[in-house]
A protein has these predicted regions:
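Broad hydrophobic/π-residue packing in well-ordered secondary structure
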Residues: 72-74, 154, 160-161, 199
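Noncatalytic regulatory segments and standalone regulatory/sensor domains
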Residues: 138-149, 160-248
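Active-site-adjacent substructure of cysteine-protease-like catalytic cores
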Residues: 90-172
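Cysteine-nucleophile protease catalytic domains, especially the papain-like/related folds used
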Residues: 1-110, 200-205, 210-248
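General "foldedness" signal
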Residues: 11, 15, 127-131, 184-186, ...
Length: 248
């Protein structure tokens, strides 16, 4: 994910290492791999665990990688799907308000949007029904089955638009190229709302990525829309050497 997001923002390398290298970005994001995975394929240190609940990538780790790789020029703004008590924060009205705030910046190229979500809330991007003809139908979101991948995932948004019916859709850039159309994955935004709220006992949310100097203003606009800005946890270990704070 970050291997194409960061170079697209003009950050191609750090300390002589290319930011398009998956193993380097995994190191910066403090990813925890499975204990059975061959650590020899990683050129940089990564943690490992035999406990599935302690594997994967945390949202704070992603924010860490963005901040360090950009030399502090980019900042992440975390918006959790649920509030601190565990109730859904991003209900329909707040979700639409958040998209209304983010859309102009995203469409102008001033912001990136990264989702940390439960895949099984989305349309099944490998199902036979997930094809251009069916996706073009007005009832696509009701006739294409939901996914059954059974994982949490990160993916950035690549496009956002409204259909003639007014229904909002987006395109995800999935790092798994066997999904969708070589990783290009149209999805209804309402299903993404459900996906970041999550029903799998894990935390989800949205990371808004902007220039450091633009972060404070965007935080205020998001909060004025009735949406709290707060880092969430998704069960994967957060970095022990870095903590998010506004502007980082």
């Amino acid at each position: 994910m970050l291997t194409y997001l960061l170079p697209a923002r003009g950050f191609a390398q750090l300390d002589g290492e290319p930011l398009g290298a998956e193993d380097y970005m995994a190191h910066l994001a403090r990813v925890t791999i499975t204990a059975s995975e061959d650590q020899g394929k990683y050129r940089f240190p990564v943690d490992s665990s035999a406990d599935p609940s302690q594997q994967g990538t945390s949202p704070e780790g992603v924010a860490r990688a963005i901040a360090i790789a950009s030399g502090g020029q980019l900042a992440s703004i975390p918006v959790p799907g649920r509030d601190a008590s565990g109730r859904p924060q991003l209900d329909g009205p707040r979700w639409e308000a958040l998209l209304d705030v983010v859309a102009p910046r995203f469409l102008d190229g001033a912001a990136d949007v990264i989702f940390n979500y439960e895949t099984d809330q989305l349309l099944a991007a490998r199902d036979a029904a997930y094809n251009p003809e069916t996706l073009g139908r007005a009832d696509a979101s009701t006739i294409i089955p939901r996914d059954s991948w059974g994982v949490g995932h990160f993916a950035p948004m690549a496009a956002l638009w409204r259909r003639p019916s007014g229904e909002r859709w987006m395109v995800l850039l999935n790092s798994f190229k066997e999904r969708g159309f070589a990783g290009i994955e149209p999805q209804p935004t309402e299903l993404m709302r459900r996906a970041v709220v999550r029903e799998d006992d894990r935390g989800g949310g949205v990371l808004l990525v902007v220039k450091h100097e633009a972060a404070d203003r965007l935080i205020k606009e998001v909060e004025r829309a009735g949406v709290d800005v707060r880092m969430w946890t998704n069960g994967s270990p957060a970095p022990s050497d870095w903590r998010w704070s506004p502007g980082r």
